[in-house]
From Swiss-Prot:
Assigned protein family: Belongs to the RemA family.
TM segment ranges: none
InterPro entries named among the record's database cross-references: RemA-like (IPR007169)
The name this protein goes by in its record: Putative regulatory protein Moth_0891
Amino acid sequence: MDIKLINIGFGNIVSARRIVAIVSPESAPIKRIIQEARDRGMLIDATYGRRTRAVIITDSDHIILSAVQPETVAHRLSSREPLASAEEPVD
């Protein structure tokens, strides 16, 4: 089974299958989503102290903050050639 992994910056990688949305962090509703995820313990900050440029929403209700532009993450997600891939060993 081939798993497509997406680099979201600074060596952080997310499974492409788990991504539901990639959005910009500027709007009030997205800021609320980030705060609610922080309160629930479902926020993953992958910015390494840099400015948040993309908010990735996953199917498990985790919210991931990335310092990479949303367009860049989307381009990596839609590219035919995965940046990183892993194959599950066959028993």
